[in-house]
Amino acid sequence: MAAHTPIRECIGCGGKFPKNELLRIVYDGSETMIDADSKKEGRGAYLCKNKECLDMCIKRKKLNRAFKCSIREENYNKLNEEMRHFVE
């Protein structure tokens, strides 16, 4: 019997993918950060590892909805710089 693979939704494109194919972004109450190991505490959101989903997330401020709060512009800018190392 095959092991269950968790499915998560990308906040950029809305597609559903296996959890290990997506990048987790965490909000700990004060800042957003990339959680490449899926071990950090805080509310998480998932994003495809491609430039289009990243750009859509930033342009439409999708993290505000995912984290149910207002994310500051400097957090989006910081995330944009960090994400460039992970996107294809």
What do these predicted regions represent?
Residues 1-6, 37-41:
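Short, flexible, mixed-charge glycine/proline-rich loop motifs
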Residues 7-10, 45:
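Residues immediately within or flanking Cys/His clusters that coordinate Zn2+
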Residues 11-12, 85:
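Catalytic cores of RNA-modifying enzymes
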Residues 14, 49-52:
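Cys/His-coordinated zinc-binding microdomains
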Residues 18-35:
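Short recognition patches in nucleic-acid-associated and regulatory proteins
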Residues 44-45, 49, 66:
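Amphipathic, hydrophobic secondary-structure cores in small proteins
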Residues 60-88:
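C-terminal structural segments of small proteins and small subunits
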